[in-house]
Amino acid sequence: MSMQDPIADMLTRIRNGQAANKTAVSMPSSKLKVAIANLLKEEGFIEDYKVEGDTKPTLELVLKYFQGKPVVETIQRISRPGLRIYKKKDALPKVMAGMGIAVISTSKGVMTDRAARQAGLGGEIICYVA
């Protein structure tokens, strides 16, 4: 059986891994997943990530904790295969009044809501992370 929403699966693996106090989670890799992992690392939500394997690449995320608690409080899928959510640059959301990030897929690549506002770009809202 094929996976219907690989991004939702990635976010669920992160959520479940942190709930179980895992040090790392692994999943099948894709360019979009690597771009999201790179953003999460830049914003300080995960320690690190790496892609292993040539024929079937696997993405491994090293989860981050602060004083024994997960750094990621909430991670929520917004745009999904059955209902895509697009916003113009003026309508981009602020997650937790700027404390979290919205991951946006734009014509210039995957970026945070802050970077998209600065670049004057709108796009598909992939997920919220706080």
Curated annotation (Swiss-Prot):
Q: Output the Pfam families linked to this UniProt entry.
A: Ribosomal_S8
GO BP annotations of the record are: translation
Q: Which InterPro entries match?
A: Ribosomal_uS8, Ribosomal_uS8_CS, Ribosomal_uS8_sf
Lineage, top-rank taxon, reads: Bacteria
The record's keywords, sorted A to Z, are: Ribonucleoprotein, Ribosomal protein, RNA-binding, rRNA-binding
Q: Which GO terms describe its cellular component?
A: ribonucleoprotein complex; ribosome
Coiled-coil boundaries: none
UniProt GO molecular function: rRNA binding; structural constituent of ribosome
Give a short account of what the protein does: One of the primary rRNA binding proteins, it binds directly to 16S rRNA central domain where it helps coordinate assembly of the platform of the 30S subunit.
Q: Which NCBIfam families match?
A: PRK00136.1
Task: Report the sequence similarity comment from the record.
Answer: Belongs to the universal ribosomal protein uS8 family.
How is the subunit organization of this protein annotated in UniProt? Part of the 30S ribosomal subunit. Contacts proteins S5 and S12.
Q: Which HAMAP family match?
A: Ribosomal_uS8_B (MF_01302_B)
* Name under which the protein is recorded: Small ribosomal subunit protein uS8
> What is the species of this protein?
Sodalis glossinidius (strain morsitans)
Q: What is the lineage of its organism?
A: Bacteria, Pseudomonadati, Pseudomonadota, Gammaproteobacteria, Enterobacterales
